[in-house]
Amino acid sequence: MASKRTLKRAIHSICEDLFAEAIAVSLYGAKGQQGNAEALLFSILRLEDEFIRRASHIEPGMTAKAYFNSLAEDFRVQVSAVVDQLNS
């Protein structure tokens, strides 16, 4: 990422798309999925908040490149987990 601003916008955009999918599942999915969708909505909001906060402040002792590579990898893992929950 070229800047923190770009990174934050990318995080917001991805979480916004995930949130829209979770809303669709809660409205149009099976009855059993609707209860899980509400918990998933809250987890998506927490995910966005956590990673935008982490993008704002680099951990002391780490180089910026290593920190942001770690941040991107952690975000990919969390997004994959949310997508797996949406698909199940």
What is each residue range found by the language model?
Residues 8, 12-15, 19, 41-45, ...:
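Generic structural concept
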Residues 2-12, 35-38, 62, 66-69:
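Short, solvent-exposed segments of well-ordered alpha helices
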Residues 22-54:
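Amphipathic alpha-helical interaction modules
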Residues 42, 50-88:
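Low-complexity intrinsically disordered segments
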